[in-house]
């Protein structure tokens, strides 16, 4: 029999020490990885609940196991809230991740060998948008569009020309490193012109979309998929939304289960339900507005300090800094900033001359620092400190000074107060 006072501490000290160290790192370091955020204690409470014990293959009311009456309530809540939050006719909350959500969409809409048109990973797309090393580029015939080299913006004329030439079965609109708005209406017009499905991967901007501060893809797309973390600030997981098409919805359900997954993670689905309820609040809308303001403030400082920001700025939660002009690798910049307790990720920039393991850029995002309570003033200061380090990459005194400034601001803005 288990007792409620069973703890990891004292039982598995190696693991407990690592968990404690990670909590301290999160509190003492500034997090600027665009795909990371902090979940609320409510979300973590759901994830740590007894719902993790329940197997529930199938869907609410149509399970393959008994005893699902209460987890059915949790999943029904998550589905209803997702549909309300995004104004969608259909929601599947079972995908374990964004990549598995995307995989299910491919499986539902395509046959092996069908042509897909997606954004090049080298220009800001995602592995699951047709990269050759991913299932999406191995099982399907992938054609890639990119950014205009002069403007740093998506070239919709190129997208249309490629669509007309290759006649894809599905066009993917979405990104992992693009700082501007997407024209979903134009994407849909192109898809309709060639008889393709439009699939939108809004994993990075779902929270912004929910708050009405980024264009809404749901009215334009046949299918939308997203993660539930990142800007949405929920548990790590996936979500699929779709239009009012019963046949399409059945295909999507079958592609998730039994096509790609077995039992859903009911504790994570409960956490998704919590996340969606949090996202309906006025506080969440204000948070998303601040995320965008903070990203713009940081990008402005980098530009003022002489750094090239890809696409000329940002209209969402992230931006890319090109370090080609400074002859600094993304790998070295990442390491130097990390020493100062500023966590970013090295990232390829369009037409990057260096390998993906080295890169010539940094991807910077503001969801996590905004959760801490940073506003424009703190973000401008932070961007200035980062520029100081990048301008003096080998100067330990500069790095040490910035680390002290980081420690002070983190103490003022704790993650979990």
From Swiss-Prot:
Cofactor: pyridoxal 5'-phosphate
Feature type site, description Plays an important role in substrate specificity: 229
Binding site for (6S)-5,6,7,8-tetrahydrofolate: 121, 125-127, 355-357
Gene3D superfamilies found in the cross-reference section: Aspartate Aminotransferase, domain 1, Type I PLP-dependent aspartate aminotransferase-like (Major domain)
InterPro entries for the chain: PyrdxlP-dep_Trfase, PyrdxlP-dep_Trfase_major, PyrdxlP-dep_Trfase_small, Ser_HO-MeTrfase, Ser_HO-MeTrfase-like, Ser_HO-MeTrfase_PLP_BS, SHMT-like_dom
Annotated keywords: Amino-acid biosynthesis, Cytoplasm, One-carbon metabolism, Pyridoxal phosphate, Transferase
Subcellular location: Cytoplasm
E.C. no: 2.1.2.1
Recorded GO CC terms: cytosol
Pathway: One-carbon metabolism; tetrahydrofolate interconversion; Amino-acid biosynthesis; glycine biosynthesis; glycine from L-serine: step 1/1
Modified residues (N6-(pyridoxal phosphate)lysine): 230
GO molecular function, one term: pyridoxal phosphate binding
Domain of life: Bacteria
Disulfide bonds: none
Pfam families referenced in this protein's UniProt entry, alphabetically: SHMT
Example GO biological process: glycine biosynthetic process from serine
Catalytic activity: (6R)-5,10-methylene-5,6,7,8-tetrahydrofolate + glycine + H2O = (6S)-5,6,7,8-tetrahydrofolate + L-serine
Subunit structure comment from the entry: Homodimer.
PANTHER family in UniProt: SERINE HYDROXYMETHYLTRANSFERASE
Protein purpose: Catalyzes the reversible interconversion of serine and glycine with tetrahydrofolate (THF) serving as the one-carbon carrier. This reaction serves as the major source of one-carbon groups required for the biosynthesis of purines, thymidylate, methionine, and other important biomolecules. Also exhibits THF-independent aldolase activity toward beta-hydroxyamino acids, producing glycine and aldehydes, via a retro-aldol mechanism.
Family: Belongs to the SHMT family.
HAMAP family, sorted: SHMT (MF_00051)
Protein's name according to its UniProt entry: Serine hydroxymethyltransferase
Species this protein is from: Marinobacter nauticus (strain ATCC 700491 / DSM 11845 / VT8) (Marinobacter aquaeolei)
Lineage: Bacteria, Pseudomonadati, Pseudomonadota, Gammaproteobacteria, Pseudomonadales
């Amino acid at each position: 029999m288990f007792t409620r006072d069973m703890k990891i501490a004292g039982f598995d000290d190696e693991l407990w020490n690592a968990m404690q160290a990670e909590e301290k790192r999160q509190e003492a370091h500034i997090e600027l990885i665009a795909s990371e955020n902090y979940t609320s204690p409510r979300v973590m409470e759901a994830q740590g609940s007894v719902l993790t014990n329940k197997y529930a293959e199938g869907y609410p009311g149509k399970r393959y196991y008994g005893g699902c009456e209460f987890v059915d309530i949790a999943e029904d809540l998550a589905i209803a809230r997702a549909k309300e939050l995004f104004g969608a006719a259909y929601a599947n909350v079972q995908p374990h991740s964004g990549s598995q959500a995307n995989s299910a969409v491919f499986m539902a809409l395509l046959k092996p060998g069908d042509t897909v048109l997606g954004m090049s990973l080298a220009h800001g797309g995602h592995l699951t948008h047709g990269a050759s090393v991913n299932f999406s580029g191995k099982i399907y015939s992938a054609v890639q569009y990119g950014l205009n080299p002069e403007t740093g913006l998506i070239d919709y004329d190129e997208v249309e020309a490629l669509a007309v030439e290759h006649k894809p079965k599905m066009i993917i609109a979405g990104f992992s490193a693009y700082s501007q708005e997407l024209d979903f209406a134009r994407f849909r017009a192109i898809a309709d012109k060639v008889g393709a499905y439009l699939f939108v991967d809004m994993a990075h901007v779902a929270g912004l979309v929910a708050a009405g501060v980024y264009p809404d893809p749901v009215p334009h797309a046949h299918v939308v998929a997203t993660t539930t973390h990142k800007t949405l600030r929920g548990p790590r997981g996936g979500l699929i939304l779709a239009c009012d098409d019963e046949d399409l919805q059945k295909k999507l359900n079958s592609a998730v289960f039994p096509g790609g997954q077995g039992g859903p993670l009911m504790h994570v689905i409960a956490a998704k339900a919590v996340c969606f309820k949090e996202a309906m609040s006025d506080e969440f809308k204000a948070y998303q507005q601040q995320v965008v303001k903070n990203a713009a403030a940081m990008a402005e400082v980098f530009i003022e300090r002489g750094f090239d920001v890809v696409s000329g700025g940002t209209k969402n939660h992230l931006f890319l800094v090109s370090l080609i002009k400074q002859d600094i690798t993304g790998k070295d910049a990442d390491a130097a900033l990390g020493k100062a307790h500023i966590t970013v990720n090295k990232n390829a920039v369009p037409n990057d001359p260096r390998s993906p393991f080295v890169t010539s850029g940094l991807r910077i995002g503001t969801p996590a620092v905004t959760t801490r309570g940073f506003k424009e003033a703190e973000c401008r200061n932070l961007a200035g400190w980062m520029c100081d380090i990048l301008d003096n990459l080998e100067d330990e005194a500069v790095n040490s000074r910035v680390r002290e400034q980081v420690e002070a601001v983190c103490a003022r803005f704790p993650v979990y107060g």
